[in-house]
Amino acid sequence: MAGLRPGAGVPPGTPWPISPGKHCVRSAISRRARLPYHAPGTPLGRFRRAPDEGSCRMAHIAFFILPAAGHVNPTLGVAEELAARGHRVTYALPEDMADRAVRVGARAVTYPLDRERFRADMVPKEESDEYTDEGEFLKVLEWLLDTTADTLPLLESAFAEDRPDVVANDPSTFWTGLLLAGKWDIPVIRSTPSYASNEHWALHPPFEPGAAQVDPALIELTARAEKLLKEHGTTSDPVAFAATVQSGPGLFYMPRYFQYAGETFDDRHHFVGPCAPRASFHGTWQRPEDGRPLVMVSLGTIYNERPGIFRACVEAFRDRPWNILLVLGGGLGAGDLGPLPENVLVRDFVPLGDVLPHTDLLVNHGGTSTAMEALAHGVPIVAMPEMPEPRATARRIAELDLGDWLLPGEVTAEKLSGIAQRVLTDDRIRKGLDRMRGEIRRAGGPAVAADVIEGLLSPAA
């Protein structure tokens, strides 16, 4: 299986909108062999080497990202840009996501992941705005520690002959990337698809269980964390170590304008906007030729098994002269939705980069990554958020006149039809979308994100 070069599949002569990079210096790295990538479909531990793509040996950047689509996808355009500049990029990912890295010109080293446990333990529950339940917090901490312990020796071995020069680390994920960066004494940059937090605004207030209520299991997990950190040569204080996750420079995949209290964040916070890749990994898409407006409905890839909501969307728009695209996200099947009118199209997944330029309205779960891509194309949004972060995004969409929102429990065909009609005809929303597109353009996207990462590289000795 050949690794794809940046630009694979792009028609000859198509210009790449890529800057040469304001920090294009060779880092002080040896000319080591390229890190083998794990070819999807081969057993764990068996690697195939990417074909030699030339003699350029600039820097090696490793991405350690929470293994969820809403965290991995926002980074792919940055990886694609870095690869196009001649850098080597490697992702640490589970097997089922490795192909995304390969398609943007990166490589992947894989680790085992129990998807059922990940979904059960790591996704905040829809009825809670924060980790106020100690049992929920304990499950998150236990998953983090278990996954760090399981992946650290595997990934340290995989990178042993080709250490990276910079680690891009998702603050939401396990600690392996941070611990390895500390061992290797290399820079770390946060890679954050969600909001920044400071003393002025935070999505999740810190979880602070009262001393009289501390579960013995929390004491045990804290001791495990101390032992793990000590074994790997860093502070044995988990609280102090966790604080480093939110310190230092960071990439945030939204414009500063969309960030709550955006003006209060210092220049360590780089709000680069959405960084969608040019490469596609969900096939191709062509808009129906009947000329009708297109409404796309998506509930993401987590809480998407909601046939009642999909049916409400169908009923809301079935008599309109519109095409309705239902994107099921791998949860339900078309048969779960009952009979559908002729203007309804059903897909499991779609390439957003192909669909959004032709979309007139997005009805979705409020996922920040998808919302940013839609807004980059000037598409208004009606959000139906389940979880804390999407609720924050839905509220921000309404505040900035980019669309509207309602809770899933409030969704009816009548309400949805009325909100959609208003969103599509409101001049304030059209003006809000125009401003947002300008803010996204000024944020700079993948080129600026790559510049920031290159700024962390050490000049050649």
Curated annotation (Swiss-Prot):
GO MF entries: hexosyltransferase activity; UDP-glycosyltransferase activity
Enzymatic class: transferase
GO biological process per UniProt: antibiotic biosynthetic process
Pfam families xrefs: EryCIII-like_C
Keyword Thylakoid (UniProt): no
Its job: Involved in the biosynthesis of mycarose which is a 6-deoxyhexose sugar required during production of the macrolide antibiotic tylosin. Catalyzes the transfer of L-mycarosyl from dTDP-beta-L-mycarose to demethyllactenocin to yield demethylmacrocin.
Name of the protein: Demethyllactenocin mycarosyltransferase
